[in-house]
Amino acid sequence: METVQSALYLFCFARSNLIGELEGTGVDGQHPLSVFRPFPNLCAVQSEVRLEDFCGATAELRMQDLAWIGPRALRHEAVVEEVMRHSPVLPVRFGTLFSSQERLAEFVDRHGAAISQFLERVANQEEWSVRGLLDRRQAGRALTSASLAAQEAQLAALLPGRRYFEEQRIRAGAEKELSLWLEETRRQVANHLRQQASDFCECPEVPRESPESGIEVVLNWAFLLPKSATPAFRARINQVNEKHAMGGLVLELSGPWPPYRFVPPLSIGATP
């Protein structure tokens, strides 16, 4: 009979004194969750998985199959978020494996100080995501209208033919003006929001809408916020939207999330 090799699947690290025994199963829906407590103040949330599910040629195919990976990724997130309700967490990426409890213990022994420092840093804090959606056509029209209004007195003094060409010149320059406006607006908004945050990072801008819609993601930011600052941060998001929505820019706020974007590099990964 062929022996099925298993591995330890890691969800996150947390404060040992704040986490009891966990109920439920891991990402495979079969193996139970467990808590490994290598130090008095530090624990790892884990479960067993079949090694072949995550390593090897067939595993590479599974990782491209949304029907397979989707429910497991959602379960991963659900476990981390459940732990986060009771303790600060250092979340790890989906599919992080260790070959044995001993290998995980060695990893914690090497990086325990950094993990503990991170847990202390994010205590009573949460990650929030902010995305900026720009309706490029609406923004272009708003800037053109503002430019025409600002130069109305000068335009009114021109002969009709000259005025027409001058208005066309203003419209033609709208795209360049839009780029400059967007760059400056991004800078101002980031500075405005960062005043409430303990940390901030810019993330890759993932397209949301089709190019034909004229709506595009023009900023994708993550903020580490003290829980007490959340109401004021929401208020600042609303202020930005009140100021810029008519000009085509709207911010979307989502969270709270585990602080994935702020985890220090620890070279976490499968260990032979």
Regions found by a protein language model. Give the residues of each.
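An interfacial alpha-helical scaffold signature
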Residues: M1-P272
